[in-house]
Amino acid sequence: MAPTTGPRNTKNAKPAVQRSKTLKRKRGQEELSSLIQRVEGLDLKESFESFSDLPLSEPTLSGLTSSHFKTLTDIQSRAISHALKGRDVLGAAKTGSGKTLAFLVPVLENLYRRQWAEHDGLGALILSPTRELAIQIFEVLRKIGRYHTFSAGLVIGGKSLREEQERLGRMNILVCTPGRMLQHLDQTALFDTYNLQMLVLDEADRILDLGFQQTVDAIVGHLPKERQTLLFSATQTKKVSDLARLSLRDPEYVAVHETASTATPAKLQQHYVIAPLPQKLDILWSFIRSNLKSKTMVFFSSGKQVRFVYESFRHMQPGIPLMHLHGRQKQGGRLDIMTNFSQAKHCVLFSTDVAARGLDFPAVDWVIQMDCPEDADTYIHRVGRTARYGRDGRAVLFLDPSEEEGMLKRLEQKKVPIEKINIKANKQQSIKDQLQNMCFKDPELKYIGQKAFISYVKSVYIQKDKEIFKLKELKLDEFASSLGLPGAPRIKFIKGDDTKQRKNAPRAAAHLSSDDEAGSDAEEGEPKTKKKEEPQVRTKYDRMFERRNQDVLAEHYSKLINDDGTMVAPPNAGAGADADEDDDFLSVKRRFDVGDETLGMSSDDSDEEDDDDDETSPKKETKVVHIDGKEALVIDSKRREKLLKSKKKLLKFKGKGTKLVYDDEGNAHEVYELEDEDQFKARGDAKEQKAKFLEEEAERTRLADLEDKEIAKQKRREKKEKRKARERELLAEAEDEEETVVQLPPYEGDHDMDGGFSASEEEEEAARPSKKPKVKFAEPDESDKGSEPWYKKSKRTDDKGGSQAPQIQTLEDLESLASGLLG
């Protein structure tokens, strides 16, 4: 038997658990106080080499160790110590130097030392200029903060706003983009930032520029002023206005590479190529074909260019995977592209500046800048996608000859070393003919190419640095031809300067220039006056014939350019031109109303009369049409004038129609004609009229029945006569088809002594064919006279006895039949 156990002492177990919790809480308080003392005694001038040298909490150190972060970079060593002390920091370092950890570690530590919990609200807010960078920051935060008890959230566009609103009030750390954050601050009722401790701006110079200025100012207005602010970027701003907007308090500027000879990583090889605008795509195609075993990023100025180059190169199949990334894509697709490009070994990514800042793509070999960046800072961020964390990298910048001098001057001011290289002409391949062929076959690709051309020209036009971007020196017609387009699309804003000149020009000069442009019309003495065309009334039939495909071949596509370089006129313009041509033949010179006194007048008299009318009556009389059953219809618009041509629409302006019936005398009466009460009473009592009406109706019904019966009887009689006539016709046809029986001529030939046929007759008998002719019918025998016809007898025999009479074909058959009948 198993030993019996006594009752458990529950009274002693509960205090033991309480004592362990108390000891654990006490030990945690001691560690926290020790950590606070270490932070307060931290020497800011001291250099640190590893994370373990810093006064960090155990959960943070465990997360860093699990994520394989051990050694500190220069920016991390200097910025983390200042941030742990609670100071505002402006951090500037080269791309790929580890700025993300430089602000994430202080965020975790400062909240940990304050014993931040879920109910304390939002403690840290991290702003990022792009969604991709926000996602990357959030992933790093999850890795190093896995052992903390904080709740962190990612708030970016492209996701459900309601789901974010439900969870936002429980978050301690938020990584977000400015636009979505401001939306929650304005619309989410339970979201409050009164207890915010830290504000972090990654890529601060981009967030503080004109693109995010109003949004960031609105966000800062919702935040408390007593907070710690951290700003990090590869190209940090020092503007007093920007720093004042964020309410920085004696910020510490940490620029670890300020004294360095270059602003870019040391292992980054930077080159530029003089590539005329029409030859850029040829050079890019040749480069991709020559580097199929590398990982390349290609930057463009606009998303339309990215899409056009991706679609066209994808059809030509260069032999390497192609991807494209721009801001117009859905958030899920952008994440998939980022993941696939990060995992790929050999790939080409066409992108806009959405991927130029902060994104960490591993092992990028080449960074190609097809279009000149807007400034040197953008160039630094673009080339920063390669040569990260001490790796090798190469960057190539394509410059038009008009952009070379100004861009090199800007790069020199930023300490960017760059060398010029030349392209071997024998290795350059032209893809102009292929692009033209694809644009001819695929109208959608042609449309994308036109949009790419327009977006590039706009991006050059809006640039502020006119020393670099000189729009008038670009060969736009040749550039459009290199894209495969039949001509350069017209862009309105290019003529902005000419518009200003025309506006400021004297009116006399403008009048003279307009007279010169009039040409032959002015010489013929016809004054050229411009009148605003009134919009024509378009019916549903006009819309039906003007209907077009609802794809990219819409009206705005056809307006871009014709193949001959002229603008495409709107649909109504063509219709009006055709109408003008048609009016030249049999056009109405003048319309006369009924009773017009000028109908018989000559042209001169009528002209004089018109002049008098114009002087006396300044207003044109309104046409009025009188319609039966309704009030007059006033024709005061073209729509009302077209209304007269539609019978269906005129029905509502007319009275209700009446249907008439005519009696035997030809008098018209309505279908349902009612009589007065006096007329009804004059004909007698109502009961008598009722009885009389029933008698009349009964008599009328009886007569109608007799007539119907006679008609039915006549129809049956006619049907019977037709049937008998048909039988007689069939019998006559049967008699006509009967054939007479063949009778042999009397025998006259010689015969032998035995009474048989001679030898010649036997030979003739043997020579007869074996098949005998058919005889369908035979003549009746003499013995059958007075009896039934033979064909009836045979038919009756067949019906009763089931045996059919033998068919008579020859004389022997007839004799055998006769002998059988005779007995």
Curated annotation (Swiss-Prot):
Limits of the Helicase C-terminal domain? 280-439
The residues covered by the Helicase ATP-binding domain are 80-254
Composition bias type Basic residues, residue spans: 714-723
The answer to whether keyword Phosphoprotein applies is: no
Compositionally biased intervals (Basic and acidic residues): 525-545, 616-625, 702-713, 776-801
Q: Where in the cell is it found?
A: Nucleus, Nucleolus
Sequence motif: DEAD box, positions: 202-205
Listed under subunit, the entry gives:
Interacts with the U3 and U14 snoRNAs. Associates with pre-ribosomal complexes.
Q: What is this protein called?
A: ATP-dependent RNA helicase dbp4
